[in-house]
Amino acid sequence: MSSNSDHHISVEHTDGVATIRFTRPSKHNAASAQLLLETLEALYRLESDDSVGAIVLTGEGAVFSAGFDLEEVPMGPASEIQSHFRLKALYYHAVIHMLARIEKPTLAAINGPAVGGGLGMSLACDLAVCTDRATFLPAWMSIGIANDASSSFYLPRIVGYRRAMEWLLTNRTLGADEAYEWGVVNRVFSEADFQSRVGEIARQLAAAPTHLQGLVKNRIQEGSSETLESCTEHEVQNVIASVGHPHFAERLAMFRSKEMRSSALAVDLDAVCGGR
């Protein structure tokens, strides 16, 4: 997909990594209806692309995303405005649901402020990293809109109930270091190192077996709302599915062979456990 003015995102492929880049820097990468639909279409295509092992979401320029594009809000009566937000919310949530459903790991590379729905989209990714100049702002309270973009689902799961309530009710801005302390991001990198470090992480994710990553995502997402018995039963089902995959046969053969000891691709249990 090209990054010209006809599109609100670009998609780049390098070393098994697909990068979805929001390309509206003059609008602070605000989520237009077109941007959301293009992002959704890109995720659909990337899901079935076997050459892609990991997906990065990031913004062009100095901002990750400012959330809903308020310039698209119609000037009509309240009913028209409500219809507009209903449709935009459905687009937004379709993207959020796809980020959860896709087997491949997703990484939010937060290059600058993540505001409102932009914050919500970053929370919906499996991992998140940011530059040391990134900031995070719920913003819904300040513009008179109830929080959405899956924030009520992901935020308390990521930062805990008290912090989620504090953040949404006070609407204060978190800097990169505090976002890391709260668990909003996994890592903070200097702006100079950001792109190279994002590339390193994304390539590492892309090199891992997608089917196992999908099983991990499913269990982590579903396990928090299950009983212990249900969770462990589903784990058994996933283990059985994974050992029936050719990847396991390959790794088992490596484990049983002498070559395994010098392989960087397999765990040396003697080294880990202190055996001979």
UniProtKB/Swiss-Prot annotation:
Pathway recorded for this protein: Xenobiotic degradation; 4-chlorobenzoate degradation; 4-hydroxybenzoate from 4-chlorobenzoate: step 2/3
PROSITE patterns hit by this protein: ENOYL_COA_HYDRATASE
SUPFAM superfamilies: ClpP/crotonase
Pfam families registered for this protein in UniProt: ECH_1 (PF00378)
CDD domains in alphabetical order: crotonase-like
Class of the enzyme per the UniProt entry, highest EC level: hydrolase
Record's keyword annotation contains Cytoplasm: no
Catalysis: reaction(s): 4-chlorobenzoyl-CoA + H2O = 4-hydroxybenzoyl-CoA + chloride + H(+)
Enzyme Commission numbers on file: 3.8.1.7
Comment on activity versus temperature: Optimum temperature is 45 degrees Celsius. Activity is lost after 5 minutes incubation at 60 degrees Celsius, but one-fifth of this activity is restored after cooling to 45 degrees Celsius.
Binding annotation for substrate: 66-71, 117, 261
Influence of pH: Optimum pH is 8.0 in MOPS buffer at 30 degrees Celsius, 7.5 in 0.1 M potassium phosphate buffer at 30 degrees Celsius, and 7.4 in 20 mM potassium phosphate/2 mM DTT buffer at 30 degrees Celsius. Retains full activity in MOPS buffer between pH 6.5 and 10.0. Is irreversibly damaged below pH 6.5 in MOPS buffer, enzyme treated at pH 6.0 in MOPS buffer only regains 40% of its original activity after re-equilibration at pH 7.2. When treated at pH 5.2 or 10.1 in 20 mM potassium phosphate/2 mM DTT buffer activity is lost completely, but is recovered within 17 minutes following readjustment to pH 7.4.
GO molecular function terms listed in the Swiss-Prot or TrEMBL record: 4-chlorobenzoyl-CoA dehalogenase activity
Name listed for the protein in its UniProt record: 4-chlorobenzoyl coenzyme A dehalogenase-2
Organism: Arthrobacter sp
Organism phylogeny: Bacteria, Bacillati, Actinomycetota, Actinomycetes, Micrococcales
